Curated annotation (Swiss-Prot):
InterPro entries named among the record's database cross-references: Ntn_hydrolases_N (IPR029055), Proteasome_alpha (IPR050115), Proteasome_alpha-type (IPR023332), Proteasome_asu_bac (IPR022296), Proteasome_sua/b (IPR001353)
UniProt biased composition (Basic and acidic residues): 244-259
Gene from which the chain derives: prcA
Domain of life: Bacteria
A Gene Ontology BP annotation from the UniProt entry: modification-dependent protein catabolic process
Quaternary organization: The 20S proteasome core is composed of 14 alpha and 14 beta subunits that assemble into four stacked heptameric rings, resulting in a barrel-shaped structure. The two inner rings, each composed of seven catalytic beta subunits, are sandwiched by two outer rings, each composed of seven alpha subunits. The catalytic chamber with the active sites is on the inside of the barrel. Has a gated structure, the ends of the cylinder being occluded by the N-termini of the alpha-subunits. Is capped by the proteasome-associated ATPase, ARC.
Family: Belongs to the peptidase T1A family.
Name used for this protein in its record: Proteasome subunit alpha
Keywords for this protein: Cytoplasm, Proteasome
Natural source organism: Rhodococcus jostii (strain RHA1)
GO terms of molecular function: threonine-type endopeptidase activity
Cellular component terms (Gene Ontology): cytoplasm; proteasome core complex, alpha-subunit complex
Amino acid sequence: MTMPYYASAEQIMRDRSELARKGIARGRSVVVLTFRDGVLFVAENPSTALHKVSELYDRLGFAAVGKYNEFENLRRAGIVHADMRGYSYDRRDVTGRSLANAYAQTLGTIFTEQPKPYEVEICVAEVGRVGSPKAPQLYRITYDGSIVDEQHFVVMGGTTEPIATAMRESYRADLDLEAAVGIAVNALRQGGAGEGEKRNVDVASLEVAVLDQSRPRRAFRRITGPALEQLIPAEPAPASEPAPESKPDTETKPADPQD
């Protein structure tokens, strides 16, 4: 007689968490940070048709890593949620916190009730109205529905630790757009596979957008083409290896044989 398969609830949750974390780590990294004029999104994304960064509503932006079809479903659902709330009440009632809470509830339900969790991690960003003293808001929502209110920047996907370390060392709150792009790109270059290994990050492999607080209604805009090329810092030249020092010839030649 065969025994029925049994796994504790703790083991099931642990297996689901491991599955989701591995799926997220396989993706390319995304950096979201606040700067002087709003919020900047910088994502490694060589595709020109599939976006990891997008607009949600007038003052809201969205970034995600993981399985594209899963976070694309979340993005579309977020847009519908925001449109319905803005139409039913007022456009000012659509906030980053309300969208982040809706995403957290959805991901938490999927994680606990569905056989397979979503392999995604998302960030919802918000900027205030023109002239508002309200600081930009960043909300990180993970695969299990956990939500974190981040203060300055968010790093998601890929090898996050070296990128987050580089951001902590170079981030300042008063950055302009060019400096913010430079810091984010240089941080992404630190996310190589090996220790100390740097990635080749250029314009063709980047998706960049901002939430510009100075824009009157729709704050989201993409930065592409020549405008992006002017902001990307040049790749540092590899250090040349020092030439080996020449050693003096101390060996004595054998004396000529005498006849």
